[in-house]
């Protein structure tokens, strides 16, 4: 399980409203033919599209560039005054998604010629819509551009001033060298006017045989159990990496003199001297979810909570927030109905516990197509729990 954990300051959490004349800036790498249509392809069956389309939709990472851009932003945050008006990451849709959301309430114009291009064969559509990772878009007033520029140069983060906030409620990409406007739309055409999606599916009731246990077949059962990846996977032996990068890892997955991966949760300290930190855990239950999607969802939350409970949480359950990652083979008969029940089940269960689920992710293409057959994955929700730990030295280990 790879991921990150951290915290944000409350006074940095709310964005300001961009004003006409403010500058639109990009921090990070160049545009390449990467992640074109990634959002659509990621929610379609593997093998549904031609290999060229699927290859162009694949995302590539550039962690070095990510670190440079993050350090530049961190430099602004840790200054006496943070001059960033608004900020947005580049995800699916690339510049189109990121930059339009920055100026959603005002409008803006982007100079296509100033967007960094690493591949000269890109079309205007590909420059605007590619999902090259490790880029951030932000709005900053013109008088503070030099400050950001100096910080970016210090951190070796590429920085590009690519446009202006206009206040005309239009979003425009314009190339002065070509004399064309690949995109010029009213903001109301882009936000809040899309039709509602209506999904139709039917519930399929599946019946399973009762569990039959024969003690004489114990070793056969054990052999089958150890074939499960969640039980017998040996990645922890081969993936030997430094799990204490940065020096704030208070609890990682391995424990004891043999360093077996038995810990129920991870804990990151907030600083180098204090005892407070952030605890995190995960939970999933694909097998029970196959039989009953509501039970599978509730079990995922339950596992995450019974894992994180071994850390002293400052406000007990009120300290915990959940993230739901939906791994589901949608658009297959009965699966949309199962997903609806699973989402409803998580919502009702979390509300009854007084826990929020403020964020999440989905991968709805959990299906592999072959020439003569198809294989779908069991619909699963993976729950990540995080909470305020008030003493990183009192976490219980197995």
Question: PLM features: residue spans?
Answer:
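Glycine/proline-enriched, intrinsically flexible loops and inter-domain linkers
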Residues: 1-398
């Amino acid at each position: 399980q790879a991921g990150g954990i951290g915290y944000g300051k409350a006074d940095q959490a709310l964005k300001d409203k961009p004003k006409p004349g403010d500058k639109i800036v990009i921090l990070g790498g160049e545009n390449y033919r990467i992640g074109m249509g990634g959002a659509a392809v990621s929610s379609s069956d593997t093998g549904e599209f031609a290999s060229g389309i699927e290859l162009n939709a694949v995302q590539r990472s550039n962690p070095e560039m990510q670190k440079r851009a993050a350090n530049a932003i961190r430099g602004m945050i840790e200054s006496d005054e943070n001059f960033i008006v608004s900020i947005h990451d580049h995800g699916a849709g690339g510049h189109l998604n990121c930059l339009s959301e920055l100026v959603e309430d005002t409008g803006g114009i982007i100079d296509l010629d100033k967007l960094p291009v690493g591949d000269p064969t890109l079309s205007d559509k590909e420059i605007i819509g590619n999902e090259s990772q490790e880029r951030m878009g932000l709005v900053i007033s013109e008088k503070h551009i030099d400050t950001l520029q100096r910080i970016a140069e210090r951190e070796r983060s590429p920085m590009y001033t690519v446009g202006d906030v206009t206040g005309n409620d239009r979003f425009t990409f314009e190339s002065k060298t070509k004399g064309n406007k690949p995109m010029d739309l009213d903001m109301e055409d882009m936000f809040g006017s899309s039709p509602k999606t209506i999904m139709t599916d039917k519930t399929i009731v599946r019946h399973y045989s009762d569990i039959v246990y024969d003690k004489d077949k114990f070793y056969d059962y054990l052999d089958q159990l150890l074939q499960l990846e969640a039980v017998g996977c040996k990645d922890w032996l081969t993936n030997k990496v430094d799990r204490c990068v940065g020096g704030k890892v208070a609890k990682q997955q391995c424990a004891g003199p043999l360093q077996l991966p038995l810990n129920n949760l991870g804990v990151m300290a907030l600083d180098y001297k204090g005892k407070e930190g952030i605890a995190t855990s995960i939970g999933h239950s694909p097998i029970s979810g196959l039989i009953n999607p509501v039970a599978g969802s509730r079990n995922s939350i339950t596992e995450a909570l019974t894992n994180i409970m071994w850390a002293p949480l400052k406000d007990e359950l009120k300290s915990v927030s959940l993230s739901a990652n939906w791994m589901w083979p949608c658009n297959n008969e009965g699966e949309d109905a199962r997903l609806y029940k699973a989402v409803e089940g998580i919502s009702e269960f979390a509300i009854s516990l007084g826990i929020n689920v403020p964020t999440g992710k989905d991968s709805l293409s959990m299906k592999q197509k072959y020439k003569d057959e198809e294989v779908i994955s069991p619909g699963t929700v993976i729950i990540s729990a995080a909470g305020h730990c008030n003493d990183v030295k009192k976490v219980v280990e197995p």
